[in-house]
């Protein structure tokens, strides 16, 4: 396994560890999820470039689109929670149930 793949996998692992450890604020959870999606995008792009599989060239772009949608929904939820409750604690998400 090359050094680049190990660095990307380590970045994903560190983002996942950050997501599991810092669960109190929504902003830190969103940043950790963005780090995970970015490392997945880089890993998918490197894998497709190294395997010369031309039919799957759109897969990293589709992953990037899903990451952008996830970020937009997360930021909208963050703005709604911070305007309603004044804080961005994850525990306030339980209060949003209908």
Swiss-Prot record:
EC number: 7.1.1.2
Protein name: NADH-ubiquinone oxidoreductase chain 4L
Organism of origin: Berardius bairdii
Family recorded in the similarity comment: Belongs to the complex I subunit 4L family.
First and last residue of the signal peptide: none
Gene Ontology terms, MF aspect: NADH dehydrogenase (ubiquinone) activity
Task of the protein: Core subunit of the mitochondrial membrane respiratory chain NADH dehydrogenase (Complex I) which catalyzes electron transfer from NADH through the respiratory chain, using ubiquinone as an electron acceptor. Part of the enzyme membrane arm which is embedded in the lipid bilayer and involved in proton translocation.
Subunit-level organization: Core subunit of respiratory chain NADH dehydrogenase (Complex I) which is composed of 45 different subunits.
Mode of membrane association: Multi-pass membrane protein
Catalytic activity: a ubiquinone + NADH + 5 H(+)(in) = a ubiquinol + NAD(+) + 4 H(+)(out)
GO terms for biological process, alphabetical: ATP synthesis coupled electron transport
Gene3D superfamilies: 1.10.287.3510
Top-level taxon: Eukaryota
Keywords carried by this UniProt record: Electron transport, Membrane, Mitochondrion, Mitochondrion inner membrane, NAD, Respiratory chain, Translocase, Transmembrane, Transmembrane helix, Transport, Ubiquinone
Pfam entry (one): Oxidored_q2
InterPro entries: NADH_UbQ_OxRdtase_chain4L/K, NUOK/Mnh_C1-like
């Amino acid at each position: 396994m090359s050094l680049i793949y190990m660095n990307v996998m380590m970045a994903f692992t560190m983002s996942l560890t950050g997501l599991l450890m810092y669960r109190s604020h929504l902003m830190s959870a969103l940043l950790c999820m963005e780090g995970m999606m970015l490392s997945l995008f880089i890993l998918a792009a490197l894998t497709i470039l190294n395997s010369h599989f031309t039919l799957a060239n759109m897969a990293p772009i589709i992953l990037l689109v899903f990451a952008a949608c996830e970020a937009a929904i997360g930021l909208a939820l963050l703005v709604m929670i911070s305007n309603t409750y004044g804080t961005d604690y994850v525990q306030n998400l339980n209060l949003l149930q209908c």
